[in-house]
Every structure is written in C-alpha cells, then in structure tokens.
Swiss-Prot record:
<dbReference type="InterPro" id="IPR008504">
    <property type="entry name" value="Emc6"/>
</dbReference>
<comment type="function">
    <text>Part of the endoplasmic reticulum membrane protein complex (EMC) that enables the energy-independent insertion into endoplasmic reticulum membranes of newly synthesized membrane proteins. Preferentially accommodates proteins with transmembrane domains that are weakly hydrophobic or contain destabilizing features such as charged and aromatic residues. Involved in the cotranslational insertion of multi-pass membrane proteins in which stop-transfer membrane-anchor sequences become ER membrane spanning helices.</text>
</comment>
<keyword id="KW-0472">Membrane</keyword>
<keyword id="KW-1133">Transmembrane helix</keyword>
<dbReference type="GO" id="GO:0005789">
    <property type="term" value="C:endoplasmic reticulum membrane"/>
</dbReference>
<dbReference type="GO" id="GO:0045050">
    <property type="term" value="P:protein insertion into ER membrane by stop-transfer membrane-anchor sequence"/>
</dbReference>
<dbReference type="GO" id="GO:0071816">
    <property type="term" value="P:tail-anchored membrane protein insertion into ER membrane"/>
</dbReference>
<comment type="similarity">
    <text>Belongs to the EMC6 family.</text>
</comment>
<dbReference type="GO" id="GO:0072546">
    <property type="term" value="C:EMC complex"/>
</dbReference>
<dbReference type="GO" id="GO:0016020">
    <property type="term" value="C:membrane"/>
</dbReference>
<feature type="topological domain" description="Cytoplasmic">
    <location>
        <begin position="72"/>
        <end position="89"/>
    </location>
</feature>
<dbReference type="InterPro" id="IPR029008">
    <property type="entry name" value="EMC6-like"/>
</dbReference>
<feature type="topological domain" description="Lumenal">
    <location>
        <begin position="45"/>
        <end position="50"/>
    </location>
</feature>
<comment type="subunit">
    <text>Component of the ER membrane protein complex (EMC).</text>
</comment>
<feature type="topological domain" description="Cytoplasmic">
    <location>
        <begin position="1"/>
        <end position="28"/>
    </location>
</feature>
<feature type="transmembrane region" description="Helical">
    <location>
        <begin position="29"/>
        <end position="44"/>
    </location>
</feature>
<protein>
    <recommendedName>
        <fullName>ER membrane protein complex subunit 6</fullName>
    </recommendedName>
</protein>
Amino acid sequence: MASVAAKREGPQFISEVSVRGNGAVLDYCRTSVSALSGATAGILGLTGLYGFVFYFLASFLLSLLLILKAGRRWNKCFKSRRLLFTGGLVGGLFTYVLFWTFLYGMVHVY
C-alpha cells in the first residue's frame, strides 16, 4: 500500500499545445494591460520618463498578479517563471506608446 500512495518519480511531461495556449493568454493579458495603461497615462497627461515608469509599474503589477494566480504550482502551466515577468514586455511597450500618444493628443492637444 505504501508504494501506491507514494508519489510517482520521474520526468514531468508537458503538453506543447497547453504551453502555447498559456503563452497566448499571457500575450493577450500583456497587450490588454499595455493598451489600458497607455490610455490611462495619456489621459493623465504623463510625459517623458514618468510615462515609461508608469508602463513598467503596470507591467510589474500584472506580473505579480499572474504569479499569484499561478500559485505554487506554476510549473504545471509554464516552462519557466521568467516568462511570467518578461513575456511580451517589448511588444507591450509598443502598444503602450501607441495608446499613450494617441490619448495624450486627443485629450491635451486637441
């Protein structure tokens, strides 16, 4: 009975389809938060370094929320924890700047 109750030792198998699906969800979350935070920064009138600091704070907050959501068993969903922090960071920056400049121009220039 002890052998049945013991945990199975060996390599952990990961579904590539699930990993890609989780990556797509992360990209969607990162893009959505980038657009929302860019719009917020534009409406608030942030300029220069304050705007970029706002993006990195919003991105860091999203990463913390994703880590909390994944919990202790993050390795069942992702290959590495670094993906939760850096995945889509640069692509999100381009989305952020697009919404930031658009909303800043609409609210404060026109």
